[in-house]
A protein has these predicted regions:
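Solvent-exposed loop and capping/linker segments of extracellular ligand-binding repeat ectodomains
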Residues: 1-14, 19-37, 47, 51-443
Length: 443
């Protein structure tokens, strides 16, 4: 004998109920129904969803069952087998900015599912550092313009960006949307060679470190890095000589320190070191030395080639050693992070940096070397927070004909001779009461 089971999908606009005939005493076997943007939560005996129906129940008479639905969230999460973390994939996400949380229900989100956000209309994507695995094609077929990820690739061996857009190898750069302009890589590990191979449409790139890579190595060739205008390296122990060579469009640069490492002096402590000594299209030659004597004797200087359009440099940490920015004629701005451990600005550090507009001496600086801003073009200088500076050395601002405004440190004791020699644009200056000595020709 047969009995009829009527399956009512139980929502406005639903298709007509379907009837399933089964043998009396059998259990219901039917695939779970689906509904866009909703998750099926089981069958109930009433349309009011008061009594759940157990699908293992033997059915001996005609019966009508009613579906229960729950609206899907924008993001869906799946608990890992060990119960310690979650993976994430799309629910009803409608496009636009996608922000993946670092935690869900008190546990870390560690994985983005393969194809988990494929073709969902995402334009800006943020993946937190808690994520250690991004599945293949996780963000495929989206016109993403800005992307923040903890690693380049899946974090599990496929160490190239195109993987998370569905590519099998780094050679398939076309998988990466050409709308992508800004890429931020989190974590603290340097990326692998060819991780961005062939992706020549980026113009804003932030990396956690470079290690022994050059930017050209990262992109699989120098031809792919000529469009990057904003570049940041946030950490790491070192940057190789010439690591940034070929970045001809560069306008803004953030570095973890000046030169090869945080503590290097000599050639390795010069800003131009990371751009190298070989010319490239869009570069200009600078001569940087380690003293004022080197400045007036270019044959004693080191030669570097720096992007012609580079205007702004942000230094995250470390001292500025002798001659560091000597003859950097295009720079208009050099700034330091608020938490930078900068205590020293060396001799001739900005000598000949003729385009400088304003400069704020970091609060932790206690010593500024002779000739530090001599022949520079700096117009305004703020030393008011650097209250450990007690001496303005000779020629610190000498021959600077553009300097118009300066705030001196409140604990200043000595202004040495020639400190402001030929600073003809400086009309007014407030000298702290703490000053006891002013050298000859100081002004």
């Amino acid at each position: 004998m047969q009995v009829d089971v009527t399956l009512n999908l139980n929502y406005d606009g639903a298709p007509a109920p379907t009837v399933v005939s089964i043998a009396e005493g059998e259990t219901l076997y039917a695939e779970n129904p689906t509904r866009d943007e909703y998750e099926f939560k089981g069958w109930y005996l009433e349309a009011t969803l008061e009594t759940p129906f157990d699908v293992t129940t033997q059915i001996n008479e005609d019966i009508t069952l009613y579906a229960k639905w729950e609206v899907l969230p924008e993001l869906r999460f799946e608990l890992s087998a060990d119960g310690n973390s979650y993976s994430v994939f799309a629910g009803t996400f409608k496009g636009g900015e996608l922000v993946i949380p670092a935690t869900y229900e008190g546990k870390p989100v560690t994985e983005v599912k393969a194809e988990g956000f494929k073709n969902v209309g995402a334009t800006k994507v943020y993946v937190p550092d808690s994520v250690t695995k991004i599945g293949k094609g996780a963000f495929a077929e989206n016109n993403i313009t800005e992307l923040t990820v903890p690693v380049l690739g899946d974090g599990q061996g496929n160490a190239f960006l195109a993987y998370i857009f569905g590519a099998d190898s780094a050679d398939n750069a076309s998988a990466v949307p050409e709308t992508l302009r800004k890429l931020v890589v989190g974590g603290n590990a340097a990326p692998a060679a060819n991780a961005l191979k062939g992706i020549d449409w980026l113009n804003d790139l932030t990396l956690p470190a470079l290690g022994d890579l050059s930017v050209a190595n990262l992109f699989g060739g120098g031809d792919y890095i000529t469009g990057i205008e904003i570049f940041a390296v946030l950490g790491g122990d070192s940057i190789e000589k010439g690591a940034l060579a070929g970045m001809s469009a560069l306008k803004e640069l953030t570095v973890p320190f000046v030169g090869a490492t945080k503590n290097d002096t000599g050639e390795e402590g010069l800003f131009g070191y990371i751009f190298g000594s070989d010319s490239y299209s869009g570069s200009f030659e600078i001569k940087s030395g380690l003293s004022a004597e080197d400045y007036i004797s270019p044959e004693l200087c080191f030669t570097f080639y720096v992007p012609q359009g580079l205007k702004k440099v942000t230094v995250l940490d470390g001292d500025v050693f002798d001659g560091a920015f000597m003859n950097m004629r295009t720079l208009t701005e050099v700034v330091f992070a608020d938490d930078a451990d900068t205590t020293y600005i060396g001799e001739a550090a900005f000598m000949g940096a003729t385009a400088l507009e304003g400069f704020t001496v970091p609060a932790g600086v206690s010593i500024v070397g002779d000739y530090a801003f001599c022949f520079s073009g700096v117009r305004t200088v703020d030393m008011s927070e650097a209250d450990e500076i007690t001496v303005l050395p000779e020629y610190i601002f000498g021959e600077n004909t553009r300097l118009a405004t300066i705030s001196l440190p409140e604990n200043l004791v000595t202004i040495e001779g020639y400190a402001f020699y030929m600073a003809s644009a400086l009309k007014n200056i407030v000298i702290p009461d703490s000053v006891t000595t002013i050298g000859e020709y100081a002004f």
